[in-house]
Amino acid sequence: MGQPELHRSRVRRFQRLLEEKGIDAAIIRTLSSFAYFTGVKWLRPALLIPSEGDPIVFAFEDEAQEVEERTGIRDVRTWRRVGELMAGISGAIRDGGFKVVGFDYSLERDAYVLFFELFKKVNRQVEVRDVHPLIMELRMVKDEHEIELIKRASKLCSRGMEAAVDAVEPGVSELEVAAEVYHTLMKAGSRHPLVYVDAGPSVRIHAEPLPDVRVRRGYPVTVVVAADYGGYYADMTRTVFVGLLSEDAKKAFDVFMEAHSLAEDGLKPGTILANVQKDLERLFHEKGYGSNMVIGFAHGVGLLVEEDPITTIVPPHRRYQVKKGMVLASLHAPLTLPGTGVIKVEDTYVIEEDGAKRLTEYEYELKK
């Protein structure tokens, strides 16, 4: 099912990287990387990719047939008790004579630290290495199939944002706004959407929608809509102004939009992300918002809403170079205005030869 040859080619590219680094095999337990190599998001994933030869997938006994059909991987080994899963993986490593084994060190659903620690205890003869950078070396640059899915996810973001704007009214709770967006997106085919809502004067970044925080007249409402299609995400943020707009809020919005354009213009192949960040910091300081800005203007988008490069929480990623085929969300970091709320406008872009092409489409100036 899906695109078996596409996923086999990804496995082969990864195997070449493993061989170059002297790694005998890699165990994939992160949901997004399992999907990258198999085309399937399957809970409790376990995939063993040797540097040479066919991959092995480990599945719950009664799921094995469907896993084989959906992934196209013929070597499916089963378990019924959790201990049998570890025994099966350890046995495959011993049988393969693997001495150096990679793990995807990532904080993600189903990437269990307990499994990792138990693996090291059971397989003391094995040297364990982090293969997350190798996987993301592949995942950061999208192919045409991935970009097409992200384009379709972008259209869903627009539908979700329209539902959010319609729902924003004085007295409505953040949770009620989010509920309308979730309903719209899931009815449209988004399986795992994410929605964040911050109604001023509350100041929260990446705000989980709260039932007791309500939209108030005269304050901004910032809405983040992340929709997925075919497993791939697009990410969009807009700020809705409710009632009369204060001069301070309007000025902050105008400055943020200037920064949004500056970042968009800076996302060209060959650009170092930190250099764009410096330009943004200079602008915010010149305009009087140096103490209101948050460092980290962009992040990757793909099988995760936020994936490498993540310039907010992983400082080394700020040294990464923009490449053609990357998909990035910008301007990610908001302006936080105590007593007013949060100002943020964010879009998803694909990097082409001549610069960033915006994929998410929705108007910027939103007033209710």
Task: Outline where the language-model segments fall.
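Active-site neighborhoods and metal-handling regions in enzymes and metal-associated proteins
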Residues: 1-368
